[in-house]
């Protein structure tokens, strides 16, 4: 059960103990965290578009969002949550995040909405468990779900987290500091084949085998402890012509390790069906992805969700077997120049959204209807 200190104003419930922390609680200018999008220079990506897409679901009962529930499955420091709670003064919001430091900041930021907010410390693929734990059904209980994927600006800016290759810090990369495996654990202990597989699958690194071989040779006499040590090795392992194109030579390796440490792609694959199940009829799901591996998963799950459930080969649509969802976006939406100028992080975003149209739980492995 959550402790008393985790219930400021009797509202903020935490799924697991979340100690208050001063880690990385300053803005770039060194000041204390304050409410608003100035926190850590944090501006929520595509905030207005997310509001526009989710508003019809959140205002079905009342224009102010009363009786509606929104799950922000990647709460972070609360930028999107603050926007929705301000826009819809009757809305109830459930915020999930695995990062206790982010939750601590969001908790302060959203305190003025405390009577309408529940914050839960958990991975987002525990969505169904979290809903049940706090009194909500895992099926058809919420009006909207929002995912803003990837590493946050706060995590990148917090040097000690080890996400950035621009600083010499411990090789960590854990979104939840209590997670058992760090990037250093992977680099120092996984065998060469496993390392190469991680770099190839999660970083799409074409020099994966070469880098893995260099890592294994180096760690045999000196284990890796810092990001700078790994960056130096990558400069040695990647051929000079390749280093001069395609961005920083460490970019793909760091992405791959971060995804592996935090099990990001498996978590995403597992949570999307649960998020679809959680939506009420007319409920909406919005996902912001920042790299192609995430977006492919979202695209595939959405395509399955909007497909007919009539068995392949039948010449007609069986009654009651139509799709339970419809797409709200044509392909992935991208930020325009104005959005990118306001928020450079939005340059990489791919936004997809859909809406539930019928009752029913989605199968784990949906079967697509074939051509008649």
From Swiss-Prot:
User: What GO CC terms are in its UniProt record?
Assistant: cytoplasm
Residues bound to S-adenosyl-L-methionine: 78-80, 97, 124, 148, 155
List, in alphabetical order, the GO biological process terms annotated in this UniProt record.
rRNA base methylation
Does this entry carry the keyword Zinc? no
UniProt keywords, alphabetically: Cytoplasm, Methyltransferase, rRNA processing, S-adenosyl-L-methionine, Transferase
Q: What Gene3D superfamilies does this protein's entry cite?
A: Putative methyltransferase TM0872, insert domain (1.10.150.170), Vaccinia Virus protein VP39 (3.40.50.150)
Q: Which GO terms describe its molecular function?
A: rRNA (cytosine-N4-)-methyltransferase activity
Transmembrane segment boundaries: none
| Entry's EC annotation | 2.1.1.199
Which stretch is the leader sequence? none
The chemistry this enzyme catalyses reads: cytidine(1402) in 16S rRNA + S-adenosyl-L-methionine = N(4)-methylcytidine(1402) in 16S rRNA + S-adenosyl-L-homocysteine + H(+)
User: Which SUPFAM superfamilies does the annotation name?
Assistant: Putative methyltransferase TM0872, insert domain (SSF81799), S-adenosyl-L-methionine-dependent methyltransferases (SSF53335)
| Record's function text | Specifically methylates the N4 position of cytidine in position 1402 (C1402) of 16S rRNA.
Q: Which family does it belong to?
A: Belongs to the methyltransferase superfamily. RsmH family.
Q: What is this protein called?
A: Ribosomal RNA small subunit methyltransferase H
UniProt organism field: Mycobacterium leprae (strain TN)
What gene name does this entry carry?
rsmH
